[in-house]
From Swiss-Prot:
<comment type="function">
    <text>Functions as a positive effector of cell expansion through modulation of auxin transport.</text>
</comment>
<dbReference type="InterPro" id="IPR003676">
    <property type="entry name" value="SAUR_fam"/>
</dbReference>
<dbReference type="Pfam" id="PF02519">
    <property type="entry name" value="Auxin_inducible"/>
</dbReference>
<dbReference type="GO" id="GO:0005886">
    <property type="term" value="C:plasma membrane"/>
</dbReference>
<keyword id="KW-0341">Growth regulation</keyword>
<dbReference type="GO" id="GO:0009734">
    <property type="term" value="P:auxin-activated signaling pathway"/>
</dbReference>
<comment type="similarity">
    <text>Belongs to the ARG7 family.</text>
</comment>
<dbReference type="GO" id="GO:0009733">
    <property type="term" value="P:response to auxin"/>
</dbReference>
<keyword id="KW-0472">Membrane</keyword>
<protein>
    <recommendedName>
        <fullName>Auxin-responsive protein SAUR20</fullName>
    </recommendedName>
</protein>
<keyword id="KW-0927">Auxin signaling pathway</keyword>
<keyword id="KW-0217">Developmental protein</keyword>
<keyword id="KW-1003">Cell membrane</keyword>
Length: 91
């Protein structure tokens, strides 16, 4: 049950934007997540301090360097993995 609550909390914080061109609000970072179909998420900048989020960023750097195909930060992992990793930050 706690896992379900943490996933619901993650969905609130990881608000998916439908407009790719909109700017991220202050204190948030836009990232594109997914393997073939990329979805845009807004994550709090505090996630940058989390070791597991830093590992996702390292994976992104290895795959894309500084040339991201979406024009923003792209994290090459399945969407459910991203949600699982980031849902742990709310505990």
């Amino acid at each position: 049950m706690a896992f379900v609550r943490s996933l619901l909390g993650a969905k609130k914080i990881l608000s998916r934007s439908t407009t790719a061109a909109s700017a991220a609000p202050k204190g948030f970072l836009a990232v594109y997540v997914g393997e073939s179909q990329k979805k845009r998420y807004l994550v709090p900048i505090s996630y940058l301090n989390q070791p597991s989020f830093q590992a996702l960023l390292s994976k992104s750097e290895e795959e894309f360097g500084f040339d991201h195909p979406m024009g923003g930060l792209t994290i090459p992992c399945p969407e459910d993995t991203f949600i699982n990793v980031t849902s742990r930050f709310q505990r």
